[in-house]
Amino acid sequence: MKTSILEGKTAFITGVASPNGMGFATAKALAEWGASLGILDISHRVFDREKDLKEMGVAVKAYKVDLQDRAGIKAAADDMTAVYGKVDILANVAGMAYFGTEEIFKNVADLNEGEWDFSIGINLKSTFNTTQAFLQGMIDRQYGKIINVSSVTGPLVANPGESPYCAAKAAIVGLTRALALEVGKQNITVNAVAPGWIKTGASTESELAGGLNTGMGRPGTPDEVARLIRFLASDDSSYITGQLIVIDGGNIIQEYKGPSELYY
C-alpha cells in the first residue's frame, strides 16, 4: 500500500544487488511510503535495481562501491547529500555468511586470518563504515534513523563452523546499542533487526529446508523483513532505540527444531 508517511525523507540502503534480496525489498518498501533513495552495492547489478526502481517512478541514485572502501563510501555519502540535501534514514542491509572461499563452514581451529578478516569486514566493518559516513549529517540536522541488519545467528544462537559470521553479527548489536546511547539526545534512533530463515535468491537448499521447521512452518520473505525495517525508519518508532528485534517465525523460541511430525 502506497502512502506518504516517508514523503520528504531520503533513505540510503546497502546490499541492493539481487532482485530477490532483503536490500532491494527494503528499497521498494521505503519507496512505497514516499522516500527518495540512494542504493549501494559492490556488484554492477545495483544499476539494474536502480533501473527497476526508476520504472516504478522512484527517485533513486545507485552507487557501485565496496563497503570496505571508506573513501568510496564517503564520496557516495557526500554525493547523496549534494543531490538530495540530506539523508534521514540509513539501512545497513549488506552482509553474507561466507569466508570469500568455496567453503561454507570452517571451524576456528582451521580458520586463517584472511578468512576471519573477510567475514568481519563484509559484515561488521561495512556497517561501521557506512554509519560513520552518514552520522555527522544526522547529528548536524538533529534527526536520523539507522537500522542495522544483524541476525539471530550470533546474538542469540550459533552454528559450528560460522564463528566469524556469528562474531560479526553479535558485534553489530553491540555497535547498535552503544551508538543509540551516543546519539539518542540528537533525535537519532539506532536499532537492529535479527532475521532467521529468510528465503532469498541466495538461500541454499539446506537453509530453505530449515525454514520449514520454524514455528510458522515456513521461511520468512525479504518483504517481511523490509516492512519491519520500514517501521523502524518511520516516526511510528520514535521512542524505540538500541533494540534488537527478532523476525524469525518463532524459530529460536523452540526447544525442538526438527520436523513437527517427529515430536508433536
For each of these PLM feature ranges, what is it?
Residues 214-225, 236:
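A conserved structural motif in NAD(P)-dependent oxidoreductases
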Residues 230, 241-264:
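Short C-terminal tail/terminal secondary-structure segment
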Residues 4-38:
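Canonical Rossmann dinucleotide-binding motif of NAD(H)/NADP(H)-dependent dehydrogenases/reductases
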Residues 184, 189, 240-242:
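Short, small/polar-rich loop/turn modules that mediate ligand/substrate recognition or access, typified
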Residues 136, 155, 181-182, 238:
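Alpha-helical segment proximal to the catalytic Tyr-Lys
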Residues 131, 168, 176:
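Active-site helix of classical SDR
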Residues 75-82, 101-110, 114-121:
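Active-site Tyr-X3-Lys motif and surrounding loop/helix of classical short-chain dehydrogenase/reductase
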Residues 88, 96, 109-128, 143, ...:
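Catalytic Tyr-X3-Lys loop
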